[in-house]
């Protein structure tokens, strides 16, 4: 099977997944201010919330504009960041933010936030392609909202 994403009827999943969605909803709607409070009201532990929060989404959320955050470590060489930007453009990702640290010992940390609602491929394919760029040492998925 290709990809990591599935659409599953919640009736066949453990109740904990719906509780995580409930905690996320409480935070999103401003009904609670802290994760501890949201987890308590949803009937889950904070560790359960943190374990699943970046992997569980309501179906309606997946149809809206989505954002992905990922980090990279790149070598301090001419053209590396440009190559990554070209890949993001080619797959239809819309760059929202780029944050690059100063190179230390020849390596720089770069963080991207991109809108993936118009992308032509899935996130895993995009990250795999970026990982193949000469000068990209590490690519790490951080979060999706």
Curated annotation (Swiss-Prot):
Q: What is this protein called?
A: UPF0735 ACT domain-containing protein CPE1414
Q: Where is the ACT domain?
A: 69-144
The record ties this protein, via HAMAP family, to: UPF0735
Q: Which domain of life is it from?
A: Bacteria
Q: Which family does it belong to?
A: Belongs to the UPF0735 family.
Species per Swiss-Prot/TrEMBL record: Clostridium perfringens (strain 13 / Type A)
Q: Which InterPro entries has this protein been placed in?
A: ACT-like_dom_sf, ACT_dom, UPF0735_ACT_dom-cont
> PROSITE patterns, alphabetically?
ACT
């Amino acid at each position: 099977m290709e990809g990591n994403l599935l659409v599953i009827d919640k009736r066949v999943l453990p109740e904990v997944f719906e509780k995580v969605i409930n905690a996320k909803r409480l935070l999103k709607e401003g009904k609670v201010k802290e994760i501890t409070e949201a987890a308590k009201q949803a009937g889950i532990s904070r560790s359960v919330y943190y374990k699943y929060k970046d992997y569980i989404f309501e179906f309606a959320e997946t149809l809206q504009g989505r954002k992905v955050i990922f980090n990279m470590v790149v070598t301090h060489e001419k053209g590396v960041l440009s190559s990554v930007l070209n890949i993001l453009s080619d797959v239809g990702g819309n760059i929202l933010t780029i944050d690059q640290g100063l190179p230390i010992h020849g390596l720089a940390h770069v963080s991207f936030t991109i809108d993936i609602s118009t992308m032509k491929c899935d996130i895993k394919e995009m990250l795999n392609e970026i990982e193949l760029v000469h000068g990209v040492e590490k690519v790490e998925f951080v979060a999706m909202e």
